[in-house]
A protein has these predicted regions:
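Feature captures the catalytic cores and cofactor-binding loops of soluble hydro-lyases/lyases
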Residues: 31-32, 36-159
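Short, structured beta-strand/loop micro-motifs enriched in basic residues and often containing a Trp
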Residues: 1-9
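Active-site/ligand-binding-proximal alpha/beta "capping" segment
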Residues: 88, 164-182
Length: 182
């Protein structure tokens, strides 16, 4: 089923999302990859505040290519989510509600998704140029020394994704394999 959703992603929104749903996201989302996730966790370990408002936030695992003149961002395809698996449960426990990436997630992340009524979306790998057309604004907000891995705030319109793991832990990667094997 196709659903149009707007950030911030709240529990009311995740309650209506099911594994296999196609979604079109509009609103502000953050971009962070493994180096930025590591720094955020280190900040928390030192008793510092996070550089982003994590409550009901969506984090897109992506490192963009440079923007062409007149464009807010270059190619913006998803990166492999498993690299964030050691950091994601803590951020989910602090209020993050959605992640966008590609690939499978660990049991620990799935447990945190269920515990926090969150959701994991997949974006289509290899479609970064197409996905960038949905990004209307891009701003580096911290860790600019990380270059493409800096934390960015994006404004997206009708950004396409698929619900892979819903708030109940239903996992499209597992159900699709079972369905295909029939």
């Amino acid at each position: 089923m196709d659903k149009h959703i707007t950030t911030p992603i709240t529990e009311e929104i995740t309650a209506d999302l099911h594994s296999g749903d196609y979604v079109y996201i509009t609103g502000e989302i953050y971009v962070a990859r493994d180096a930025a996730h590591k720094r955020m966790i280190e900040a928390l370990d030192h008793g510092d505040e996070l550089p982003i408002d994590i409550k009901d936030a969506t984090i897109y695992y992506m490192g963009p290519s440079p923007a062409r003149e007149g464009h807010p961002i270059g190619s913006a395809g998803p990166t492999t989510a498993t690299r964030m698996d050691k950091y994601a449960p803590r951020l989910l426990d602090l209020g993050e509600k959605a992640m966008i990436g590609k690939g499978k997630r660990s049991k620990e992340v799935i447990d945190a998704i269920i515990r926090n009524k969150a959701v994991y979306f997949a974006a289509v790998g290899g479609a970064g140029a197409l996905l960038s057309k949905c990004i209307k604004k891009s701003e580096v907000i911290c860790y600019d020394d990380l270059g493409a891995e800096a934390i960015r705030k994006l404004y997206v319109e009708d950004f396409p994704a698929i619900v892979v793991i819903d708030k109940d832990g239903n996992n499209l990667y597992e159900t699709a394999i079972k369905e295909f094997a029939k």
